[in-house]
Structures are given as C-alpha cells and as structure tokens.
Amino acid sequence: MKNTVLAAVLVLGFNSASHSQSTPLTEYSATYEASANGLAATGTRSLTKTGANSYELSNSLVASLVGQSLAQMNQLSAFELVDDQILPQNYSYTLTGVSRASHAISFNWDAALATSSEDDESWQIPLHSGVIDELSYQTAIRKALIADTDIGSTLSFEIIDGDEIEIHEYRRAGNEVLSTPIGDLTTVKLEQVRDASDERVTEIWLATDWNFLLVRMEQLNNSGLRIELELKSAVLGGVEIEAND
C-alpha cells in the first residue's frame, strides 16, 4: 500500500483468562544509513519495554538531498507479549515532507475487530489468532529465529495492510558474514517468497550473535529501483554491538 521510497526502505494470538510466563524481549536502539537512487537517508529503530508485558517498537527515517531534509517517516507499534506471542494493540505510520501519507490500526481483541484507517478511508477487519501489523511482524521474525535457527524452513505471517490481511512468507537462505560500519557480523539471510512472475526482491540479514537484530535490507521493485538499508550502530540490552572476534 505504501508506494514511496521511504516506505519501501522500512517499511499473535487472542487474549485469554490466564497466561503462561512469556520470555521478556531484550530492549535495543539502533541507527541505520540508507540509499535509493542517490537519495540518502538516516534511520533509527528502538524496542522499549513500557510495562510488565508491554512494548513499543519505533522506526523513523529522514531522507535528505544535498543536506536538505526532504521527508520524514515514523512508525510505531505498541504490543503486548502474551503466552510468548505478540498481541498488537496500536500501530501508526506517518509520512511528511514532499509526500504525505498516514495509516493507523487499532486492535480490539475482545471484539475480534481491527479498525484500519489510511488517509481519508477506514475499514473494519475481523481479527483472528496470528494477525499482526506491518512493524511488529519484524519482532515476530526475530522471535521465531531465536526459537528455531534451522536453515531452510519458511516463516509465514498474517499482516494487516490497508483494508486486508496479507500473508508474507520468508525463506531462510543460509548464513553470511557481512562487512558493515561496525565491522564483520555473522548473519542469517532471509528472502521474501513471491510468485515467479513477480520481479520484486526483498532480502534481509539478521545478526545471529545479537538476537537477530536487523543488519541489512535490500529491495528491488518492479520499476528497477534498488533500496538498501545498513546498520551503523546499535545497543542491545545495554551492550554496544561489536564486530566478530
């Protein structure tokens, strides 16, 4: 639904009466540098614990040209961790600058309904177990990899996008050592699964020694535009990420 360069760059279960203990998520903050057809951008991402089982995942990106800020994108996902599963509560996306767009989702798990609004439109979407938003699914990927690091299986997620629920699938394609501004980092590479006729490509690399934090992302869209995002620095659980020994 998001057709801007910024969105291309950056772009689980019902509550119950009793809950088992969930494994806490590790807080982190990270900065990224990005590029797309000569357009430079800087990004920040952080995961913050806001309550006993509550978290906020934030993502921002500022694009500039010749030192002038052109646009800013902000994403925020507030979710709870229930029975070790991600339960989204609210999601927001805003784009300001040369282009403007907004998207918000409110999850009502008691009523099994989500209210999704995009610019001037709004929709009611029935909820079922496993549905998440366009930002918290990235935490779901990391949790899945932490639980099971066998290479070769496919990860599947149901994500609200505008007025519908889409299925996103990622295939684990092996491990790679990447050279980054931090130094060499060992990563697992994921490829988004698409139809054979779809020319779009999405590849992401996650640090195996650092809770599968996002290290790099590359996207190629139908028009041939290539977008790249790379980790510049990060602190995970109070520890600064370092290169391989």
Feature names for model-found ranges:
Residues 16-20:
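Sec/Tat signal peptide C-region and signal peptidase I cleavage site
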Residues 7-13:
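Bacterial N-terminal signal peptides
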Residues 1-4:
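Positively charged n-region of N-terminal signal peptides that target proteins for export
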Residues 14, 124-131, 162-164, 199-200:
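Short, exposed beta-strand "edge-strand" segments with a Pro/Gly-rich flavor and a Y/T-containing core
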Residues 21-109, 147-245:
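Acidic, serine/threonine-rich low-complexity disordered tracts
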Residues 100-146:
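Hydrophobic, well-structured mid-protein blocks that either form specific transmembrane helices
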